[in-house]
Amino acid sequence: MTTVIKNGTVYQNGHLIKADVLIDGQKIKAIGTDLEGEEIIDASGMIVSPGLVDVHVHYRDPGQTYKEDIKTGSQAAARGGFTTVGAMPNVTPVPNTAELMDKMVRENQKKGLVHILQYGPVTNDETTDIIPDYAALKKAGAFALSNDGHGVQSAQTMYLAMQKAKENNLIIAAHAQDDSLFNKGIVNEGIAAEKLDLPPVTELAETTQIARDLLLAQKTGVHYHICHVSTKTSVELVRLAKARGIKVTCEVAPHHILLTDSDIPEDNAYFKMNPPLRSKEDQVALLVGLLDGTIDLIATDHAPHAKAEKQGGMRGAAFGITGSETAFSTLYTRFVKEEKVFTLEQLLSLLTDKPATVFGIENAGLLAPGENADIAIFDIEHQREIKEDDFKSKGVNTPFTGHKVYGETVMTFVDGKVVYQRGTK
């Protein structure tokens, strides 16, 4: 069966063009004008984009499915316009053997509505210094390595891990955190910590480990990717490392450029995430880093939790917020429509072709004849209010509830199949 998406504005190769998109089965057959198909979808006034790519999600499956599972996580991704995601390995059990990795890959394929790429762990259970068999993990389907949620505390362990990752052509995506400096902190050292009388998190917990790892990456030649950079100094370190030819890339999460620690209104656990919300100076540096290419891409760090884990203030609450269903609309509304920090083309690139390129993900992040029909259609004129009742995710832990935004997902295709349509349950 053929389907033609007509009259939309298509994001292709860095440009927005008026065109139709013809889908034949699982593939894009043509992009052009006056195309015909058996089924017609009118996208007048809408943006037709490659499916968004999110290299940083937490699906909690197996082991913590009361928070999220593969089905609900991928439903949330589809509602947000994401068609390819990278799932972190902080599940129970951690997929640290070929057998466990193979099982996870098969479960992702079986239950997921979108393409789910599975991370393997840097160390066996993300906290030990035991390095698993990377070759076996890669053969079983691991697309990259991460201990996200934990920094690798031992420099020697990270050095050995980088050497082995380099041998196996695997990216290490690091959660940069020195636990001795993090010191059980909750919010950024500064305005929020003082106002709320909460334990502070110094930026040094992030920056010192980035500095260490950049030296190790320079020595080993590994592709070192930094998850959710959040400070001005982190951006400066990456900028310097890139200038020196170190193979480093990094991402920023939407909340770190949309919010600062001064936006935390009270002791509200929906504002508790790791890294924490930083200062206005840090926020500006992150935006500059995105604009000049120091920061390569945007990734959500979608981290759903049960409501009970986000009640009673920050001290006893879990770290993390959801992001799949709010990312595009909040970013578009603030930085394209209102403040004009980015063009729409720049924002779409940071969410499509750039993450696909950084991680070498084939058949993702672009619209072209012969490519997979992974497509998102966005209504950038319709305003909606972010409401908990609308979420597909089990987690509703977001500080953006009640915000009025533009850029709603109208329809999402994966391999030519509609996996989300606005107005359907």
UniProtKB/Swiss-Prot annotation:
Entry EC no(s): 3.5.2.3
GO BP, sorted A to Z: 'de novo' UMP biosynthetic process; purine nucleobase catabolic process
InterPro entries, per the entry: Amidohydro-rel, DHOase, DHOase/Allantoinase_Hydrolase, Dihydroorotase_CS, Metal-dep_hydrolase_composite, Metal_Hydrolase
CDD domains membership: DHOase_IIa
Positions bound to substrate: 58-60, 90, 274, 305, 319-320
The protein's required cofactors: Zn(2+)
Annotated metabolic or biological route of this protein: Pyrimidine metabolism; UMP biosynthesis via de novo pathway; (S)-dihydroorotate from bicarbonate: step 3/3
GO cellular component term, pick one: cytoplasm
Annotated positions binding Zn(2+) 1: 56, 58, 148, 301
GO molecular function: allantoinase activity; dihydroorotase activity; zinc ion binding
Binding of Zn(2+) 2, residues: 148, 175, 228
Alphabetized NCBIfam families for the sequence: PRK09357.1-2, pyrC_multi
Function: Catalyzes the reversible cyclization of carbamoyl aspartate to dihydroorotate.
HAMAP family in UniProt: PyrC_classI_B (MF_00220_B)
Sequence similarity: Belongs to the metallo-dependent hydrolases superfamily. DHOase family. Class I DHOase subfamily.
Protein name from the UniProt record: Dihydroorotase
Gene (UniProt): pyrC
